[in-house]
Amino acid sequence: MEVKGFIEIMRPHNCILAGIVGILGALVAYEGIPDIKTLTLIFWVVYFGCSGGNTANDYFDYEIDKINRPNRPLPRGAMSRRAALYYALLQYAIGSILAYFLNIRAFVFATIAYFLTFLYGWKLKPLPLVGNITVAALTAATPIYGAIGVGRIGLAGYLAICAFLVNVSREIMKDIEDIEGDKALGARTLPIIIGEKKAAIIAAIFGFLTVIASFLPVKVGIGLGYAPIIIVDIIIIKASIDVLRDPKAASKGQKLLKIATFVAVISFLAGALTKGV
């Protein structure tokens, strides 16, 4: 076993980002600064949900990763599959305990979200579009969790809508990117069933819907700090048009959408803190 494999399988950079998004969701909803204890708990509950889900996903994706990502910890033999499963369950348990110290709604929400991350890797991921929507919903749940942690939703609801739409687009692009490995293993992802071109059209539609949804907060008086959302919209439009022109651009497109998502969260935060300005 490799010690570094236990860190790598968590994908800590993604989990740290998710934890930060959870905190930002709390800040956006609170329209101010909650106490540090609450923000710390939100960060770690989101972190362990993300890391547990990533670990479980690698457990279930072992055969696919041997083709698509042979350098991942399990395919290269950094740890056994059984160890990965127990490790995922341990992370879920730690996150659930921490969630209990926030409030009962935060505990219930986290428990449901954790179960969905496990169910996704176990059963939902191979289902065309269903798997994509599940991942997008879990991503959108991150800022909402932060909002629940501070006891209010506020602008975090609009952030969740945008996060859901853009991540459906991104997940479809990722399926287009992985189409060869998925075909080799007999997977039935959306691009395999309806073709790369039609899948690209659906991905682009969700991208354009995100741009439209990004204007919703303006109606409720979000602050001037929200202005950088224009840059986000430009990035999303570019990624959507590129994949429409050539589905092979999906790899670059999904990375652009990941960047756009983070910039959007910052824009929502700045808008919430400058509300009324």
From Swiss-Prot:
One of its GO terms (molecular function) is magnesium ion binding. Pathway: Membrane lipid metabolism; glycerophospholipid metabolism. GO terms for biological process: glycerophospholipid biosynthetic process. It is a multi-pass membrane protein. Its cofactor is Mg(2+). The keyword Transferase applies. Its EC number is 2.5.1.42. It is an enzyme of class 2 (transferase). One of its GO terms (cellular component) is plasma membrane. It catalyses: sn-3-O-(geranylgeranyl)glycerol 1-phosphate + (2E,6E,10E)-geranylgeranyl diphosphate = 2,3-bis-O-(geranylgeranyl)-sn-glycerol 1-phosphate + diphosphate. Belongs to the UbiA prenyltransferase family. DGGGP synthase subfamily. Prenyltransferase that catalyzes the transfer of the geranylgeranyl moiety of geranylgeranyl diphosphate (GGPP) to the C2 hydroxyl of (S)-3-O-geranylgeranylglyceryl phosphate (GGGP). This reaction is the second ether-bond-formation step in the biosynthesis of archaeal membrane lipids. This is Digeranylgeranylglyceryl phosphate synthase.
